[in-house]
Curated annotation (Swiss-Prot):
It comes from the Bacteria. GO terms for molecular function: DNA binding; DNA-directed DNA polymerase activity. It comes from Salmonella typhi. Gene3D superfamilies: DNA polymerase III-theta. SUPFAM superfamilies: DNA polymerase III theta subunit-like (SSF46575). GO terms for biological process: DNA replication. This is Uncharacterized protein YibT. The gene is yibT.
């Protein structure tokens, strides 16, 4: 049987990933300007993960350039 709170780090990582994805998607929709500000809700030990995932999602949501 799992201990209470055993999955908390995994849940935090998933939440941080979702926050980074949401920020990148809002940037893609031109709803917010690009920024490398880390929300205060992100724990300090998760800051590198947030910034890494933000860059990943920015590349993912970037429109493909047409070659001419």
């Amino acid at each position: 049987m799992a201990k209470i709170g055993e999955n908390v780090p995994l849940l935090i990582d998933k939440a941080v990933d979702f926050m980074a994805s949401s920020q990148a998607f809002r940037e893609y929709l031109n709803k917010t300007p690009p920024r490398d500000y880390v929300p205060s809700e992100v724990p300090s030990e998760s800051t590198p993960i947030y910034l890494q995932r933000l860059e990943y999602y920015r590349r993912l949501y970037r429109p493909k350039e047409e070659r001419g």
